[in-house]
Every structure is written in structure tokens, then in C-alpha cells.
């Protein structure tokens, strides 16, 4: 999409003092090409850019805007909280209330600690697993993103022969950190078992996205998550489910309720604060009691449990716990994806969609199943780039990467869905 001179000027100005002109790399449009659009405001299912062009939004600030942008109840909660003070650096009753809600909704969480971000949550969960077990090694899976802490910015070599000799995927991460992270193919149960047969008594924990939302959207095959549960039980390792993206998005009880698996620890993201900066990790009481001040595993944060995020989150959960909230959300998304698939079929374009709750994936491929990072890499990313820009031109905002999931909110209307399907029909016609 060609941008106005104003938008180009804004990006040039931003690039003078902000590296790459953005404060998070995916916003730079490197995955789709072109210059990022600067957003001025948001309301409900819509964004408006600095030229006052409106977009139907399927990014939702990368997931947390499940009620839509600027929901009046959330805005009221934040405004009321702000009048009482922005941050105290002391306990508040609102932290306890939100913790009670989370523990009530997710039975695997017996105790929970608030953090400032999902990265802080996963970083501390890894530290906690190591402190609890007295071991160093962590298992993660290809294509799963768990924040930008050093221990998790790692990619191991292919095959079991190179396990334990991982290399960082970011400069600035010491190789000594990488050697403790073992990376396995997602959905590969045999590789998991072989890894534990070789290193099991050295493995502190396994961390996994139950639905991988950072390689588009890849769901777990039957038995995969349970296999992780089983080997962790067998070897005394900590099973960590990263629900930063899926928590309260795919179902009220998160992906762990959808796939009926119980982790030892769970990490959560900014959805618990209705989109404000916040995260959390929680799980078994005996493990959580290893965290300071009760135990020797240190974690702290001046803004952890900040009152604005706590009160926004408490208000949001009142809506999420309403009867049929998630069934209505899923029905909306199913209608959208059915329409997109029909439009692609009519245009003769190899295209596939996938849905879990309110999350979705779009793939330009004729593959029957997308079950791994390799199968995702085999999709046509050039076709996605064309589709992205065609949709953006027509007022539909998708994630600017073929490797990111999309999200729908309760604010999306039938008219928004019809507009999106029509935009796709026109874009597919251009792509023939």
C-alpha cells in the first residue's frame, strides 16, 4: 500500500531517534515490505491512522484486545484507578482480587505472581524451574517464541547429535547460555522421548506454546502435550505451558482446558490487564513457594501488579465470564474464515485457514496439514505479502508477518466480517 507523504515523514522522523523507527521489530513491516502505518486511535474493532483512514483490525495489539479497543468499561476502570494514583510500590487489594480470579479460572494455578510483561513471566518461570529442580537444561521447540530473554533466544542444531550445542539466534547472547537450551521439532513426540532418554536427569523443565502462535498458528497433534506431561513426570522436570498468547483467548480456561493437560507452571500475558503492560506466572504451590520472599529464587518488579492493569483486568474478566462469550466469539471467527476460504477457492488460490477459539491462522499453501515449523516455512510467504498489502489498501489490518496469528474480538460485527470477505475477494482477484 502506498502511504501518504505524512506517513512517510512520520517514519523518517521516528527513525532518527528510535532504532528502525519502531519499538518492536515486527512493527517495521520487514516481513511484508514497505513502511509501517502510524496509528492515531482505536475504538471497538477499528484502528484509524494518522490520515484518518479506518481499518478493521485483526491484530488486537497482538491478542489482548478481546473486547475490542477502548471498551468503555475498561476505560472507566483505568480512569478511576488513575485518579487514585498510578503506582504505589506496595501491595493493593486489587492484586489479590485478580490473583483469586486467575486461580479460580485455571485450576493448575494454585499461586500466581504478577510481572510487567510476558517476557518477564517466561524468564522467571525458567529460573524457577531451575531453582526448584537444581538442574540447568531447558527444552523448547522450534518456532515457539517465549519472549526475548537470553535463555530462550536459542536455536539448537538439527538432530539429536547436536543437542546441547545450541547457538543463539540473537547477537549478544553468550554461547554459554545457549548450551543449556535444547531445541526440538514441534509436535515430534519421538524426538521428545529421545531427548529425555539422553538428557532427562539434567532437564529442569520444558516450555511450550500449547498452540504455536508465533509461526502463524500451529496446533498440537493428538498426544503431543500429554507426552510432554508424561516425560516431565517420569524425570521430575517442570512442565511449563506458555499461555501468554493463548491464555483466555482460545477459551476461558486457556489452551490447557481445550487440550485437557495440566502443567506445573503457566505463563500469562497482557490480556490479564486488558492490554495494559502486565504478565504473570503461576502454578503448583510447592514450586511457587520457591519464589522470594518465601524461597531462594529471586524475582521483583517496581510496577509488578500495578493498580491500573489490575483494575482493568478485573473488569475485563467480568465480561469474559459471561455465558456464551466464547461460543459467540468462535462463531464470528468461523464465519469469517469460511468466507475467506470460499473466496480463495473461487479465485483458484492455494489457501488454508485454521482456528482455535478466537485465534486464527492464514496460510498460502496446498499442504493438507500445518503441524511444524518446517511445514510453515514451506508456505508461500510472497503470496502473503501481496495479500497483506491488498487487504491493508482496502481497510483491513492483518499482522504484518506470515508467521503471526490473527485475533478476532467481541466488538467485530457481521458488517466488519462482510467487509473483510469482500476485501479478500478483490485482493485474491488481483493475485491471480
Curated annotation (Swiss-Prot):
It is found in: Cytoplasm. It is an enzyme of class 5 (isomerase). GO terms for molecular function: glutamate-1-semialdehyde 2,1-aminomutase activity; pyridoxal phosphate binding; transaminase activity. Its EC number is 5.4.3.8. NCBIfam families: hemL, PRK00062.1. HAMAP family: HemL_aminotrans_3. This is Glutamate-1-semialdehyde 2,1-aminomutase. It comes from Acinetobacter baylyi (strain ATCC 33305 / BD413 / ADP1).
